[in-house]
Amino acid sequence: MKVNLPAFERAGVMVVGDVMLDRYWYGPTCRISPEAPVPVVKVNTVEERPGGAANVAMNIASLGANARLVGLTGIDDAARALSKTLAEVNVKCDFVSVPTHPTITKLRVLSRNQQLIRLDFEEGFEGVDPQPLHERINQALGSIGALVLSDYAKGALTSVQTMISLARQAGVPVLIDPKGTDFERYRGATLLTPNLSEFEAVAGKCKSEDELVERGMKLIADYDLSALLVTRSEQGMTLLQPNKAPLHMPTQAQEVYDVTGAGDTVIGVLAATLAAGNTLEEACYFANAAAGVVVGKLGTSTVSPIELENAVRGRADTGFGVMTEEELRQAVASARKRGEKVVMTNGVFDILHAGHVSYLANARKLGDRLIVAVNSDASTKRLKGDSRPVNPLEQRMIVLGALESVDWVVSFEEDTPQRLIAGILPDLLVKGGDYKPEEIAGSEEVWANGGEVMVLNFEDGCSTTNIIKKIQTESEK
């Protein structure tokens, strides 16, 4: 199965928020200053990049979507540099110039890939009349599919409720990257995207995923939100929606060099994907993949369609990830030529929880490659009832494929994967639960081929059914 990128070229997004210019001075450090105990940096490279709301717009435009940027600037060199740089990447700027204030600028001095100091040049824009911003939003609502409010608490978003109201009346979703602990000002937004520390500053410290989900659902109810996405660094992302199971997505970052601007990338990709007509779950998947790319770069950065496609399909392109049966057979044949032991398991994996992750990690340790066969939606419905699955097949496979322990993911339509297993003939077939080996679908075929069959225990206290019951109970309160 292939995962296609959204039709970004059809997506229109307006970004309103705190615009700033990020300046970078680079150079070697070879001595300590005689004037003070500080390093001397011999600057040999200077870079200027759009930051804050401007970086969000850059991320949207870099995907090929139509990005419009509205914000407050001064009348100075920094504003002109921003306009020039953004125009070069097809961001349509409509700044409100405030002659009494400088454009917000942040200067970073770096040496040997280390940031030595940051200098901020700014005066807050609080007190500036927001009406020109409202007028620009109104003018664009008929031609955009999403509105992003990028809040860095610098004064551009003092009238958030008016902006949310304008967009919601026009049927345009509002995505907000929040700042501070006053979430009341974001009431009625479609989606908030706090990082974990921002979330816990409002909801309180969470000792477990269950507690995070419970407190997140309370925030959704308290502030009339449609959804909440908590970005959790190395723990990935968690999407919460009323009356839906939580969607936990593991991180896809391979190496982390700099998290500067990663939140801008996440909300930019979310908005562009939604504006292209995709679901929120799909938008989170692409945003998670993009975040994994951008943290591997230094400074505020963007993600191109090619980079995003490689991140999404990278494992499949190299013989791993979500696959068709034919692709899987070829991948297994190649693995066997390399002398690798192939392990296979199967299940619905509707709401991925810690028990699933632990079970799959243990299964992977038994061999060199792990195949996970997943029941289709129709198969799940026959097996679990009309209310299942909670998450459709493509989303279940995407999440499984993102796990480090899983090499290949494939689906099957039948009630059991017996036919699929007979075609693959893994070296080891494993199943979790209270089964006897001879009761496991495909066991006879695997044994006949000289393979092994094994039963693994699930982690106690983890159950998809219990999670669903808890969500239903909480929603009825």
Curated annotation (Swiss-Prot):
Pathway: Nucleotide-sugar biosynthesis; ADP-L-glycero-beta-D-manno-heptose biosynthesis; ADP-L-glycero-beta-D-manno-heptose from D-glycero-beta-D-manno-heptose 7-phosphate: step 1/4; Nucleotide-sugar biosynthesis; ADP-L-glycero-beta-D-manno-heptose biosynthesis; ADP-L-glycero-beta-D-manno-heptose from D-glycero-beta-D-manno-heptose 7-phosphate: step 3/4
Stretches for region Cytidylyltransferase: 344-477
Catalytic activities: D-glycero-beta-D-manno-heptose 7-phosphate + ATP = D-glycero-beta-D-manno-heptose 1,7-bisphosphate + ADP + H(+); D-glycero-beta-D-manno-heptose 1-phosphate + ATP + H(+) = ADP-D-glycero-beta-D-manno-heptose + diphosphate
Residues at the catalytic site: 264
InterPro entries: Bifunc_HldE, Carboh/pur_kinase_PfkB_CS, Cyt_trans-like, PfkB_dom, RfaE_dom_I, RfaE_dom_II, Ribokinase-like, Rossmann-like_a/b/a_fold
Entry GO CC: cytosol
Family annotation (PROSITE patterns): PFKB_KINASES_1 (PS00583)
Region entry Ribokinase, spans: 1-318
Similarity annotation: In the N-terminal section; belongs to the carbohydrate kinase PfkB family.
NCBIfam families on file: cyt_tran_rel, PRK11316.1, rfaE_dom_I, rfaE_dom_II
Subunit structure: Homodimer.
Protein name in UniProt: Bifunctional protein HldE
Lineage of the organism: Bacteria, Pseudomonadati, Pseudomonadota, Gammaproteobacteria, Enterobacterales
